[in-house]
Amino acid sequence: MTQSLADMRRDYTRDGLAEDQAPGEPFALFHQWFADAVKTEQVPVEANAMTLATVDGEGRPHCRVLLLKGLDEQGFTFFTNYDSAKGQQLQANPFAAMTFFWPALERQVRIEGRVQKVTAQESDAYYQVRPLGSRLGAWASPQSRVIAGREELEGLVKATEARFSDTQPHCPEHWGGYRLLPERIEFWQGRASRLHDRLNYRLVDGQWLRERLAP
């Protein structure tokens, strides 16, 4: 390692986040920040990439990077195999947290809340617009299970291709979407000397309460 971890740092000086710049509810601000990220972030950063944290039935946390695939007034939607590790964890504990980090903008958004499955119709609608290889993969891959090697996975894919050689694959019952219904959304804007701006929204009795947090 050419540089000590203790010496690795950068100062954030791009922008600030004041209360008079923030709306009374968080979705409008997220839409604004997300649009900024889409325009600003460059490959390999994906603006809709986020870390999803879940907790299993034994209280152990797990996290991974996923892509946000839906956003509306209800919440934030992603898709996965319901039999996967994350699916099992959400079945045991239906709460999760998301984090978006947009380094070019020096911004981060943290979201926490309850997670519920979307309707089968919503899952099918998204499934049908995926590339064919991804649709076949949803059938072929026993996600999160131990396999003997890459050859086994490729064999499963070939078998799935043969199965659907004369027809288009439909959305499997074990695959679909989850929607995180936010109860807390924090917007973080990096500032100089680690004196960052943090605006936190909490859902209280159906209304969003906005407050500033110390960095």
From Swiss-Prot:
Assembly with partners or alone: Homodimer.
Pfam families referenced in this protein's UniProt entry, alphabetically: PNP_phzG_C, PNPOx_N
Any one Gene Ontology molecular-function term assigned to this protein's record: FMN binding
InterPro entries in UniProt: Pyridox_Oxase, Pyridox_Oxase_CS, Pyridox_Oxase_N, Pyridoxamine_oxidase_dimer_C, Split_barrel_FMN-bd
PANTHER family: PYRIDOXINE-5'-PHOSPHATE OXIDASE (PTHR10851:SF0), PYRIDOXINE-5-PHOSPHATE OXIDASE (PTHR10851)
Binding site for FMN: R64, V65, L66, L67, L68, K69, F79, T80, K86, Q108, Q143, S144, W188, R198
SUPFAM superfamilies: FMN-binding split barrel
UniProt keywords, alphabetically: Flavoprotein, FMN, Oxidoreductase, Pyridoxine biosynthesis
Transmembrane segments: none
Cofactor details (free text): Binds 1 FMN per subunit.
Essential cofactor(s): FMN
Binding, substrate: R9, R10, D11, Y12, K69, Y126, R130, S134, R194, L195, H196
EC primary class: oxidoreductase
Free-text function comment from the UniProt entry: Catalyzes the oxidation of either pyridoxine 5'-phosphate (PNP) or pyridoxamine 5'-phosphate (PMP) into pyridoxal 5'-phosphate (PLP).
Membership in a protein family: Belongs to the pyridoxamine 5'-phosphate oxidase family.
One Gene Ontology term from the biological process aspect of the record: pyridoxine biosynthetic process
Keyword match Oxidoreductase: yes
Listed EC numbers: 1.4.3.5
Record's catalysed reaction(s): pyridoxamine 5'-phosphate + O2 + H2O = pyridoxal 5'-phosphate + H2O2 + NH4(+); pyridoxine 5'-phosphate + O2 = pyridoxal 5'-phosphate + H2O2
Pathway(s) annotated for this protein in UniProt: Cofactor metabolism; pyridoxal 5'-phosphate salvage; pyridoxal 5'-phosphate from pyridoxamine 5'-phosphate: step 1/1; Cofactor metabolism; pyridoxal 5'-phosphate salvage; pyridoxal 5'-phosphate from pyridoxine 5'-phosphate: step 1/1
Protein name: Pyridoxine/pyridoxamine 5'-phosphate oxidase
